[in-house]
């Protein structure tokens, strides 16, 4: 006897959902693996999801994008807690009326990928913003941190690769504080 599937289709992938992999939320059927946050693609559970117009979100991204509490207490860490004036300041353009402006979020862009940086994934170094995943060594892709990196001519390096590259070029004056490019280097160590 062959195993029979249901006639129900997954709302996310539109493929047949078998009983062993069936998950029902908001009267909609999903595969367990397809039950993911639209924003971060994280796996959801029935106890930790929200939906808006049939689109699934984890609680943090739902709150960030849709929740209007009238209070800034729920804002993500790093989000400015300064209210905007009711009318534009002199010389300032009024806010757009696009539908996208109705939703929360930010217009801050990552210098690594030029995509929007949300407060929960933001790394800020000297006023420059990065995603956590974009804040890495330019040469080797190594993980670096805001407290331990070298910025050289606008690029980020781990200490190991920066020293290696300078040795290959035969010019250590930048590391010792001499030379005309010394002002372009910033070494940060914890």
UniProtKB/Swiss-Prot annotation:
Post-translational modification N-acetylalanine, affected residues: 2
Keyword Transferase on entry = no
Q: Major place of localization? A: cytoplasm
**The organism's place on the tree of life at top rank:** Eukaryota
**Region spans: Disordered:** 74-98
* Keyword set, alphabetical order: Acetylation, Actin-binding, Cytoplasm, Cytoskeleton, LIM domain, Metal-binding, Repeat, Zinc
- A single GO BP annotation from the record? actin filament bundle assembly
- Give the GO molecular function terms: actin filament binding; metal ion binding; mRNA binding
UniProt note on tissues of expression: Expressed in roots, leaves, stems, flowers and siliques. Not detected in pollen.
Where it sits in the cell: the answer is:
Cytoplasm, Cytoskeleton
Q: Which Pfam families match?
A: LIM (PF00412)
- What's a single GO CC term here? cytoskeleton
Q: Which PROSITE patterns match?
A: LIM_DOMAIN_1 (PS00478), LIM_DOMAIN_2 (PS50023)
Q: Does the keyword Methyltransferase apply?
A: no
Positions with biased composition (Basic and acidic residues): 83-95
User: What Gene3D superfamilies does the database record attribute to this sequence?
Assistant: Cysteine Rich Protein
**Matches recorded under SUPFAM superfamilies:** Glucocorticoid receptor-like (DNA-binding domain)
Q: Where is the LIM zinc-binding domain?
A: 8-68, 108-168
Free-text function comment from the UniProt entry: Binds to actin filaments and promotes cross-linking into thick bundles. Has an actin-stabilizing activity. The actin regulatory activities are not regulated by pH and [Ca(2+)].
The further comment given in this record reads:
Cross-links actin with a constant of dissociation of 0.4 uM.
Subunit text: Interacts with F-actin.
The name under which this protein is listed is LIM domain-containing protein WLIM1
Gene name per UniProt: WLIM1
